[in-house]
Amino acid sequence: MPSLKDLKNRISSVKNTRKITKAMQMVAAAKLRRAQEAAEDARPYAERFNAVMAGLAASVGQSDTAPKLLAGTGSDQVQLLVVMTAERGLCGGFNANIAKLARQKVLDLQAAGKTVKILTVGKKGRDVLKREFGDLFVGHVDLTEVKRVGYVDAQGIAKDILARFDAGEFDVATIFYSKFQNVVTQIPTAQQIIPAEFDAEGAEATSGVVDYEPSEEAILADLLPRGVATQIFAGLLENGASEQGARMSAMDNATRNAGEMIDKLTIEYNRSRQAVITNELIEIISGAEAL
């Protein structure tokens, strides 16, 4: 049975932990508001961009002049998985859920006889996947020093991926991230970015004949690389909001659990203290009777 001193030290330790988790919860809540606004503000642009690109892609189809980023290489043998997670932990199952989705994709592709390559963004995903698929890694993007992810960061990642595609290192590229819904719900998502896939239902409807100048192919050749960067940026923003939402929820749970533990330890401390006092009284009474 722990002594009164041990119980007192444990209560003090848990109280200090509760202060830390409460502070982290408040910081995450403040960051969440900014991250959520950024993610939600980017969605209309991404949807509009998809509509324009879907219309252009539909008019070009699979013609011989279609850009390679749209038509693809004609094969899906070599798959590049771009797994985007956080640089930090203490955010519940946020990182683990993305890594789990990517891991399952790797296993499915390998079972189908495909060659898999992995590029990670964020060290938490790298640490998890590298233990099992270290030989599949072709690169890692470190955003530790980036306080607030911007479009320039997405451009850097896109530039690396496009250079690898132009060099013939892979046929299909898919990004993995967590789509933000609310504080308690973040959905691990896989989205193919090369060859480009656009929602045909989102294509802009036109009432007349549209004549593009220059040609649709030339416009697509210019916009498709930007589309890759845009999709990566949108994924990073969704990840940012999801991470803060998951951290806020995790720290809230930790704070409440710490409070419950403090209550239990306090009850145990009071019972032990009462037992000590009772024993001392018994000893005093017994001594008095002996006299």
UniProtKB/Swiss-Prot annotation:
Highest taxon listed in the record's lineage: Bacteria
Keywords recorded for this protein, A-Z: ATP synthesis, Cell inner membrane, Cell membrane, CF(1), Hydrogen ion transport, Ion transport, Membrane, Transport
Subcellular location: Cell inner membrane
The keyword Membrane appears for this protein: yes
KW S-adenosyl-L-methionine (keyword) present: no
Cellular component GO terms, alphabetical: plasma membrane; proton-transporting ATP synthase complex
InterPro entries, A to Z: ATP_synth_F1_ATPase_gsu, ATP_synth_F1_gsu, ATP_synth_F1_gsu_CS
Any single biological process term in GO: proton motive force-driven plasma membrane ATP synthesis
Annotated Pfam families: ATP-synt
Function: Produces ATP from ADP in the presence of a proton gradient across the membrane. The gamma chain is believed to be important in regulating ATPase activity and the flow of protons through the CF(0) complex.
Protein family membership: Belongs to the ATPase gamma chain family.
Subunit-level organization: F-type ATPases have 2 components, CF(1) - the catalytic core - and CF(0) - the membrane proton channel. CF(1) has five subunits: alpha(3), beta(3), gamma(1), delta(1), epsilon(1). CF(0) has three main subunits: a, b and c.
Protein name from the UniProt record: ATP synthase gamma chain
Organism: Ruegeria sp. (strain TM1040)
